[in-house]
């Protein structure tokens, strides 16, 4: 396994503010910052590759729904929805401390009732942890079960993530970022590493000179420490394996679009509009027309369903409706 560049390891997650939405409730916006003096997203190819990664990552976080995000040179803004606040970590640690310090007699009806209640609480807590935070939750539960000591609960969390409320929105985002921010550093639930799907389509749809330079740079960043030729070979193999299609086929499909009078590099805007009367932020992201056929295949493969027709702008003259494609399908059609 190649050594991964440490620039992708986040430094902290910070809650910026929350804004209200009539139908969705309170939506917190977070900022995930990276290491000091590190600006990994200045490179456009690296920045674009994380668009696909965030869509993919939040697809299996059942308790955390990604509303929108904006990527800056050295930090990421996230607007998310979470389930109601679950059990704080302090309460879990307190229950276990009581169980450890007090001698409970299973033969005593009162003690037996307390033991049953504690077991139920911990079982529900374990299920909730796995549901809300997905692979990260399963990793954390394994950490706790391996120690079997209530004293390490809070210290482990505080030392690693700087937060004491295990399942709060901030803690969940911080944990997700730490464990799964780097696509090649962690493989969620047996899935292959997250390939740079949109970066791949953007690179091979761009002008040849910029495409080749961007691909070499991306390969060097992901497969840090390898020679350039070996890094390119590994990246191409990973892309072909994950997307299930060869780069030559994508080149051919884009050439067919050009022959039919379409520009595969023409940008269109996908947007999200929460219709908040107070004027909540509207983030924008760009697509190229040539991406939509690939995007439908990708959506069917990873989300289990094709992209909804009313969620994708396929207009060539710019007069069509467009909306951000997301796992939750959030977005309102609007004229671009």
Explain the meaning of each model-derived region.
Residues 1-73, 81-336:
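Short Pro-Cys-Gly-centered "Cys-loop" motif that presents a nucleophilic cysteine in a tight turn
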């Amino acid at each position: 396994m190649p050594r991964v560049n440490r620039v992708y390891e986040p430094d902290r997650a910070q809650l910026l503010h929350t804004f209200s939405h009539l139908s969705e409730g309170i939506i917190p916006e977070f900022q995930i910052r990276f290491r000091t003096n590190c600006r990994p997203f200045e490179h456009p190819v690296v920045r674009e590759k994380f668009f696909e990664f965030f869509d993919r990552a939040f697809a299996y976080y059942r308790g955390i729904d990604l509303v929108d995000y904006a990527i800056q040179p050295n930090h990421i803004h996230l607007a998310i929805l979470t389930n109601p606040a679950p059990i704080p970590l302090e309460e879990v640690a307190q229950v276990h401390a009581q169980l450890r310090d007090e001698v409970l007699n299973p033969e005593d009806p009162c003690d037996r009732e307390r033991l049953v209640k504690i077991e139920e609480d911990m079982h529900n807590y374990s299920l909730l942890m796995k549901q809300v935070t997905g692979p990260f939750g399963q990793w954390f539960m394994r950490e706790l079960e391996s120690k079997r000591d209530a004293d390490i609960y809070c210290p482990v969390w505080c030392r690693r993530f700087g937060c004491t409320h295990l399942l709060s929105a901030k803690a969940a985002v911080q944990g997700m970022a730490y464990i799964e921010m780097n696509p090649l550093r962690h493989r969620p639930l047996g899935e292959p590493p997250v390939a740079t799907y949109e970066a791949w389509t953007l690179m091979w749809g761009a002008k040849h000179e910029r495409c080749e330079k961007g691909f070499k740079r991306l390969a060097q960043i992901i497969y840090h420490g390898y020679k350039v030729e070996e890094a390119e070979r590994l990246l191409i193999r990973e892309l072909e394996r994950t997307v299930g299609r060869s780069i030559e086929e994508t080149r051919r499909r884009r050439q067919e679009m050009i022959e039919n009078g379409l520009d595969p590099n023409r940008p269109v805007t996908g947007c999200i509009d929460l219709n908040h009367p107070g004027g909540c932020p509207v983030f924008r992201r760009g697509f190229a027309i040539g991406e939509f056929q690939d995007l439908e295949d990708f959506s069917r493969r990873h989300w289990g369903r094709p992209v909804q027709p009313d969620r994708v702008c396929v207009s060539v003259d710019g007069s069509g409706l467009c909306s951000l494609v997301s796992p939750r399908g959030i977005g309102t059609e609007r004229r671009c």
